[in-house]
Amino acid sequence: MKVTRRTVRLALAEPLRISRSTMSARDAVWLTVEDDDGRHGHGEAVTSVYYGLDTDTLERLFADAAVDLARFRDPESALEALCGGEPAGAPATVPAVTAAVGAALLDLVGKRADSPVHRLLGAPSAPTAATARTIGITSPARAGAKARRLAARGFGVLKVKAGAPDPEEDVERVRAVRAAAPRVRLLLDPNGAWTTARAEALLPRFADLGVEAVEQPLAPGDPEALAALAQRSPLPVIADEDAVGLEDVRRLAGRVHGVNVKLAKCGGVHAALRIAESIEGSGTELMLGCLTASSLGLAPAVHLVDRARWVDLDGHLLLAADPWTGIGGTDGYVTASGRPGLGVRRRPYAGHGEAEVPGEENGTLGTAAAANGPLGGREETGRADLA
C-alpha cells in the first residue's frame, strides 16, 4: 500500500473558551492509504496539548506509520493486525494515531467491499442521532442568544461549558440557556475545574435548572473521588478525562453513570467497541465525544452513534470551514453515510497556497489549506483541546 499525509490548519468560527483556556485553531494531519487499484482511505488526527501531540510529533508519528504500513499487502491484513493489538502503522501508546490509522484502513476496506463502515461493524442501516452542540464560557446574554439560535435550527441537546472562576457565572449562563431554549436537553461540562466541595454545592442548583448530566466535574487523576461524587450527585456523572482507555473504564463501570469515549483518546473504533461491550449491564452508559476536528475526524464515531446514550459529535460544526462533508449535523443530527467506507468527501476548495490531497476512488483531487507550522501553544494552550 502507498501511504501519504498532509498537514492542514483548522480554524474555528469563533474562539472556544473552556475552564482553563481558549482555542481558536488547531492543526490536523490527514493520513491517506492507497491500494493497488488507486482507491483511497483517509484518517485524521488533530494536535492536542493535553495529550502531548503537537504538529511535529504527529507528522513524525505518521511518517513512522507509513513505513510500518508498507509491510502489509492490503488494508484488510493491516486492519486485522491493528485490531489484534499489533502496531500496524501506529505506536500502541499513541491512541490518536492508532485511531487515525484505523479510520483510514476502515475507509479503504469499506470502499473495497462496497460497504459503509457501519455495515462492516454489524449495523445494517445508517446510524443517526441527535448531537449536543457546545456553548463555551461566555456571558449569560450571549449564551442565551446562541441557545435560542441553535434551538431554532433544530438542536435538541446543548452542552454548556462551565468552570468560570466565579461559579455564579456558570449558574447564570445555564439559567440564561434554559430560559432561551426551555425544551432542549442540557449537558454541563466543567472540564474538571471543580473541587468536590464546589461540585456538591453546585450540582443541586444545576439539577433544579433541568441539567440532564454533568461531565467530569472534578480534576482528573482521582477516579475514586469522581466515583464517590457520582454516588451522591443529584445529576448523572459522566467520566471523561478519568476514562481514557479500557482499563480506566473497567474500574469505573457501575460506579459512574456514564463514560465519554473519544476515539482519539481510546485508540479508535474497535477500542471504542471493546469499551462499549465492557460496560454492558453495569449501569454505566456510553457517551460518544470528540475533539474539535473535521468531518473526516468525526466520521468513524458517527458510525457508532446507535450504541450511545449521549452523543456529542459537533467538533466539525465549530470550524470556520469544514474541509470535509458527509456526516450532517447542521440540523442537530449526525448521520452515518450509506456510501462505501466512512462516506465523507472533500469539499471543493481552490485558492492560493493549498496542498493537494488524494481524493475519491475516481482519481479526483481535493485541496486543503497548508498549515503554517506547529501551533506551538500559541492558539492551542492549556486544556482547550479537550473541547
Residues covered by each model-derived region:
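A cross-domain feature marking catalytic cores of carbohydrate-active enzymes
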Residues: 45, 133-135, 160-162, 188-192, ...
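Conserved, mostly hydrophobic/aromatic
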Residues: 31, 38, 101, 114, ...
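Structured beta-strand/loop patches that form or line metal/cofactor-binding pockets in enzymes
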Residues: 1-51, 320, 324
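Metal- or metallocofactor-binding catalytic centers and their adjacent structured scaffolds
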Residues: 5-7, 34-112
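Shared catalytic-loop signature of beta/alpha-barrel
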Residues: 222-228, 232-236, 243-337
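Metal-dependent enolase-superfamily TIM-barrel catalytic cores that perform enediolate-based chemistry
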Residues: 119-233
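Flexible C-terminal active-site loop/helix
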Residues: 1-3, 7-12, 23, 291-366, ...
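N-terminal amphipathic alpha-helix/helix-capping segment at the start of soluble metabolic enzymes
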Residues: 1-3, 7, 18-23, 110-111, ...
